[in-house]
Each structure stands twice: as structure tokens, then as C-alpha cells.
Amino acid sequence: MNIFEELKARGLVFQTTDEEALVKALTEGQVSYYTGYDPTADSLHLGHLVAILTSRRLQLAGHKPYALVGGATGLIGDPSFKDAERSLQTKDTVDGWVTKIQGQLSRFLDFENGDNKAEMVNNYDWFSDISFIDFLRDVGKYYTVNYMMSKDSVKKRIETGISYTEFAYQIMQGYDFYELNDKHNVTLQIGGSDQWGNMTAGTELLRRKADKSGHVMTVPLITDSTGKKFGKSEGNAVWLDADKTSPYEMYQFWLNVMDDDAVRFLKIFTFLSLDEIAEIEKQFDAARHERLAQKILAKEVVTLVHGEEAYNQALNITEQLFAGNIKNLSAKELKQGLSNVPNYAVQAEDNLNIVELLVTSGIVNSKRQAREDVQNGAIYVNGERVQDLDYTLSDSDKIDGELTVIRRGKKKYSVLTY
């Protein structure tokens, strides 16, 4: 099975320009290819991971990746399938995001070894040297307005309005391909399926300005089995930055994917062989309640993104919280595991009697309810049941001197911080 066949078998090929020519190029020698990442935030997220890992697979097959971070295009804003104009960011902000994103990409691609080691490029390096007049003469001349208006990403914005700034985005991305082809012999661009219009603007410029052909391959935008856009948890993006989405939160995200998605996601997001995944699928189908596919998926992706130590910590937090063993975890681990539960900062003047504190912190609405809960055995302090109405929190209840975990009933957690 050649690399293109494997990508197809994993569900990673959505659309290509001349497929026969692309397969021929990939099987006959080393291809230099690029994937672009615009800095629209200070971190990449799971939505980017499909293209990143596809780029890694091609590198492992001997091809040479260029990771383009859009220091220039990030200042403009991609209109593709966005309902409204993006807010323009300052250059200092975008530069900061570029640096962080470059650091994240270095975890997935090999920038050090072999004749196909990855290279990082920033399109600000060439756009900053082009005058507006030169850009219109040397690039804009090769695009008709009819061609630019025909792009689906533009059509969807015509009725609501699109600025010239965002309208021109596609020819900036097209010029990226031309520049990388001219300087580095890059002949293939990889990106999400929503980028097809922008990407083919590159092959158009190569054809018209340099009389060369280039290839484009898009990866699918991933949805779950219900058709919902993939990569969000509770409506929020799942980030690759551990400070924005902790390894524990990412672990839980993968652990909770639906049965109908688990095996498909193993093919897309892990480097397990297709034979290994087929074997996992057999075991998974025989006992779906054990969630084997989700557990392996969570392990593989968290280890890939954050490392083995972070995976082991996420697994330990999961197991200890499930067992109610709060005291077996550090304050740092508890902050990961309980980041989404209500939090109350204890004040110096607060009464630390359990009944008083349950009301002050908002865990219950009244002292009567608090007394009932304590007497009925529904209140736990750091995993241990408290039934004494006179119980008062002390320093021994402060985990690492930082926090106390209160549980009401089986699942309602709150964190008190000091």
C-alpha cells in the first residue's frame, strides 16, 4: 500500500487536483509539500490536528514538509465560510501567536533529521518586501474578478458583505504557493476542505505566471456521527496548548467520543497501523461497554500531543476521581481534574464551620438544607464523609495548602481555594 492509498484508507483524502498525477508524483520520488497555519489565536486546536498529522504521515513516507505560519495572512483574515468579517489583530499580537504556533508544530514534525527534515517558513518574510503596486502588477494581474467571485467561500459572503481586504486573501494564499514553489520547489499543498478555493488559487497562479502545475489535496473537516463539527468540548475549542486545555481535559474529550466514531478516529488521529486498528475494532465490537477503542484513542492522542508523562497523569487523575480518592491527588492534579466545577475563594473572615461554609460558598441555598445534607451523609470533604454539624475545616483539610474539595452527593463537586 503506497502512502496515498493509506491516506485514503484512513479517510484522510477529501479532494485533490489531478489524482493520477498526484499519486505518480508521490510514488516516484520525494515531494516537497506545505501546509499553512494562520495565527488566529495563541494556540492551534484539534481542528488543525488532521492536517498536521497528515503532514507527519507524508514525512514518514519520505516526503519533505514545509510548515507555513501566516504572519502576513494572519494580519488580513481568511473569509472562508465565516459569517462575518474577522477582527483585525495588531502585528505584535500576531507575531506572538506565530511564535507559539511554531513551537507547537515542532512537536509533530521532524525539523532536525534527514534530507526530508521539515522547514518552518513565515509568509510575512516575503509579503513585507512587496510593494502594493508590485503585488497588483506581478500577482493581481493573473486573477480575474470573475474567477475570484466564483469561489464558494466568497459567494457565501456577497449578500452580507465582504471587505476588499478579505476578498484579496485568496490571492495572498495563492502567492504563498508560488513563492514556495519558486524558492523551494514545493509542488503540493495540503489543507482543510474549506480551503479548496484558496488552495486552487495557488495552482492557478503557478499555471498562469510560471507555466507550471501544482497539486492540492484537502483533508476532510471532521464531524462526529451526528454531523456535529468535531473538536469542541462544551462549546469550547479543544486546544493543543496544555495551559488552555489540560491533558486531563483532552483525555476526557477522547474518552467520551461516541462508539460509532471511535474506530474512525483511531485511523485519523493515531499512528497505529490499519492492521492494529482492525484488531482493536474486533475486540471493541465484542464488548463495547468496556470502551476499549476510546481508551486507546485517548492514550495515543494525549501521548502524541503532550507526552507520556502527561498521559499517565491524566489517567491517574481519572482513576482517583472515579474512586473518590481525592487525597491521593496533588492540588495541581485536582486543578486539572476539577477545572470545570464551581470554585469559591475562601475569605479571611469566612466561618469555616461546615454548615456555614456550605451556604457561604453557594453549594447549598440555606442552613437548613446544609444541616440536612450533613446529617444524611451527603457531604464529603476531600473524599471523606462528614456528618458532624460542628465540623470545622482546618489546615489539615487544605491539600498542599491550596484547596479543599467538597462533594455533595455522588457527583456534585465544588473546590474551595485559599
From Swiss-Prot:
Protein name: Tyrosine--tRNA ligase
Segment forming the signal sequence: none
Amino-acid positions noted as binding L-tyrosine in the UniProt annotation, renumbered to this chain: Y34, Y169, Q173
Motif ('HIGH' region): 39-48
GO biological process, one term: tyrosyl-tRNA aminoacylation
Binding residues for ATP: K232
Function recorded in the entry: Catalyzes the attachment of tyrosine to tRNA(Tyr) in a two-step reaction: tyrosine is first activated by ATP to form Tyr-AMP and then transferred to the acceptor end of tRNA(Tyr).
InterPro entries: aa-tRNA-synth_I_CS (IPR001412), aa-tRNA-synth_Ic (IPR002305), Rossmann-like_a/b/a_fold (IPR014729), S4_RNA-bd (IPR002942), S4_RNA-bd_sf (IPR036986), SYY-like_C (IPR054608), Tyr-tRNA-ligase (IPR002307), Tyr-tRNA-ligase_bac-type (IPR024088)
Family to which this protein belongs: Belongs to the class-I aminoacyl-tRNA synthetase family. TyrS type 1 subfamily.
EC identifiers of the protein: 6.1.1.1
Motif interval(s): 'KMSKS' region: 229-233
S4 RNA-binding domain: residues covered: 352-410
GO CC terms in record: cytosol
Catalyses which reaction(s): tRNA(Tyr) + L-tyrosine + ATP = L-tyrosyl-tRNA(Tyr) + AMP + diphosphate + H(+)
Compartment(s) of residence: Cytoplasm
UniProt cross-references to Pfam families, sorted A to Z: SYY_C-terminal, tRNA-synt_1b
Provenance organism: Streptococcus suis (strain 98HAH33)
Gene3D superfamilies according to UniProt: HUPs (3.40.50.620), RNA-binding S4 domain (3.10.290.10), Tyrosyl-Transfer RNA Synthetase (1.10.240.10)
GO-annotated molecular function: ATP binding; RNA binding; tyrosine-tRNA ligase activity
Subunit composition and interactions: Homodimer.
Keyword Nucleotide-binding: yes
